């Protein structure tokens, strides 16, 4: 069964042109990432049918929703999709339950995978069903908006910076629920964001946009580890590793294992065997040619240099490393690179000074 998403759009405006040609996975979270004005929201609106591209094609598996070459265009209200915007836009005269029931009325396909009580439980809003929207926090309103979208039985969920209007506390409140959706839903999610932390935590696939064009598209780490794109991530350059809790040690440390080896973090509460996603910034990795020695840095792994490239920061370079098949980035000074004679193929040790757990 074909589940791939095909999206080709050209949208011309007086001061901006969107011109994209994408093939995206039919499952998991695809993040559309870029700076303000890069075309992320325009691309998402074109996918939804809210922005009709003069030259456009959009297919979800074998279902073609738009093909301008044949004059074919299914309007947004007839598409089996859910859309969540920055603002929740709940109906103020309806309770949480009433807003969710509105989603049921919008179904364009047969059955909803989850019932209203199941969705409410999944998103942690079961205790809020009788409340009016004005008695909800920003994070709670967004969860209700997501629930309403899911009850319409969508075949794809489009999310336009759903956390942008929330403060840090509310963002941290809602992120675990988005992760739960990721694991529970069989439908693809297209997620627009300009926040690297959100992308690193949630995405499986990453599309990098700039000035209306696709700069890069691929599996998350494949794009994150590209050293020809340092300007896109700047100080946030780094990689994501998928690790597993291996052991809780007696000195309040937890050992995580990943294909490239093991890393230690402060003691975690998750049981052994639990998968954890971690982020390692390039700025938190230093390099040494010396063998493993006494050091306060616990996490030190053997690596080989793949390539290096200059960064936007004068006097610095970005080094791509291979750690038993896993990519790792290090940002060091040009002077250090010259002193250590950093070059492709060089074997060395990478010292990881900090690991950010994305959970």
UniProtKB/Swiss-Prot annotation:
Assigned GO CC terms: plasma membrane
Protein name: Molybdenum import ATP-binding protein ModC
Subunit description: The complex is composed of two ATP-binding proteins (ModC), two transmembrane proteins (ModB) and a solute-binding protein (ModA).
Class in the EC hierarchy, top level: translocase
Domain Mop: 294-359
Reaction catalyzed: molybdate(out) + ATP + H2O = molybdate(in) + ADP + phosphate + H(+)
Family membership noted in the UniProt record: Belongs to the ABC transporter superfamily. Molybdate importer (TC 3.A.1.8) family.
Molecular function GO labels: ABC-type molybdate transporter activity; ATP binding; ATP hydrolysis activity
Enzyme Commission number(s) of this protein: 7.3.2.5
Classification via Pfam families: ABC_tran (PF00005), TOBE (PF03459)
Function: Part of the ABC transporter complex ModABC involved in molybdenum import. Responsible for energy coupling to the transport system.
Recorded superkingdom: Bacteria
Organism per entry: Dechloromonas aromatica (strain RCB)
PANTHER family named among the record's database cross-references: ABC TRANSPORTER I FAMILY MEMBER 10 (PTHR43514), MOLYBDENUM IMPORT ATP-BINDING PROTEIN MODC 2 (PTHR43514:SF10)
